[in-house]
């Protein structure tokens, strides 16, 4: 299934916002208005030296016993979930973005209003995510793959959808990325509605390309 988010911030702004120390020279990417699953995206994690590094990863978390990739992981109970607990303990990462999109559910056959959600003052913001290495059986190459965490919606999102991206607040970046013996589930908070803004950006015909960011849990 598909999801959508926007990243207008360039590499330099992302590096400054997230205090990235490594990977800048080796990583190249362009801003864009509409990114979807299966695409390669810049992701921030700690490298073996404990530095914040930016690397390109595929938005398609791969599990050995599932043929289809997963794009999202539920925040609730992730520290105990069979598919996610190891990645949340050892592979926490942050995905920079500037807006997320959601299509409001309507009666069958009617057009779906598309809404944009932003966090004023956080351009870019950080989406909580997890990553892992996956060996592509076709190429025999190892690929970095990731999934975005989601949780209960706040009052702004609830009328549009029953799931919402889990955001990492700036004061929590260091703790979220740092290696720990116990997973920092206390950081997976619902962002208060007053910190976000939403606006209607389009009313489009229903299409297979307009599937929620939050449906592939």
Residue ranges and their predicted role:
Residues 1-217:
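Short linear sequence motif anchored by a di-proline
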